[in-house]
């Protein structure tokens, strides 16, 4: 049985091979020079009330890199010349997600002291939540402060370990 399994494994591994990998962006060209992109730009539809919105959109896209199909591709390799494409929006996303998480955590800690905690989790107490939301923009500094003071992490004695 072991030999049969080994034989099947050898056959499967010998027939399963990965195609050669291409370098990131090797087949990408500037959209302004891409014929497929130019064909798409000629048929650009307006997406707003502005009659030139389609043309303006494709003018902005012409600064990007396009594949052979004519569509712009997002390069996410860490080069700073493309930071505006991905790096800045991703940092902004992480900041906003952290703000939401920090404010939610602070709200749950604030209502924990009340008697109707479950009700305040379902129906937000806006009188309590709005000041917390307003101060949430400084969450990175508050997180560092709580991390250094030990408030952010639980003590080892508070963490239960189940016996096995």
From Swiss-Prot:
Keywords: Membrane, Photosynthesis, Photosystem I, Signal, Thylakoid, Transmembrane, Transmembrane helix. PANTHER family: PHOTOSYSTEM I REACTION CENTER SUBUNIT III, CHLOROPLASTIC (PTHR34939:SF1). The chain crosses the membrane at residues 83-103, 124-144. It comes from the Bacteria. It is a multi-pass membrane protein. One of its GO terms (biological process) is photosynthesis. It holds the Pfam family PSI_PsaF. InterPro entries: PSI_PsaF, PSI_PsaF_sf. Probably participates in efficiency of electron transfer from plastocyanin to P700 (or cytochrome c553 in algae and cyanobacteria). This plastocyanin-docking protein contributes to the specific association of plastocyanin to PSI. Its main location: membrane. Belongs to the PsaF family. It is found in: Cellular thylakoid membrane. This is Photosystem I reaction center subunit III. It comes from Trichormus variabilis (strain ATCC 29413 / PCC 7937) (Anabaena variabilis). Disulfide bonds: none annotated. GO terms for cellular component: photosystem I reaction center; plasma membrane-derived thylakoid membrane. Residues 1-23 form the signal peptide.
């Amino acid at each position: 049985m072991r030999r049969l399994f080994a034989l099947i494994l050898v056959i499967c591994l010998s027939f399963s091979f990965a195609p050669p990998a291409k370098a990131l962006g090797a087949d990408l060209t500037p959209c302004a020079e891409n014929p497929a992109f130019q064909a798409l730009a000629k048929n650009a539809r307006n997406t707003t009330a502005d009659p030139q919105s389609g043309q303006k959109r494709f003018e902005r896209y012409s600064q990007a890199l396009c594949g052979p199909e004519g569509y712009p591709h997002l390069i996410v390799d860490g080069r700073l010349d493309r930071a505006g494409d991905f790096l800045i929006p991703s940092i902004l996303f992480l900041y906003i997600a952290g703000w939401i998480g920090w404010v939610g955590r602070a709200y749950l800690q604030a209502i924990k002291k009340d008697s109707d905690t479950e009700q305040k989790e379902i129906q937000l107490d806006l009188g309590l939540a709005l000041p917390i939301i307003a101060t949430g923009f400084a969450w990175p500094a508050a997180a560092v402060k709580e991390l250094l003071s030990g408030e952010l992490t639980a003590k080892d004695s508070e963490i239960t370990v189940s016996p096995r």
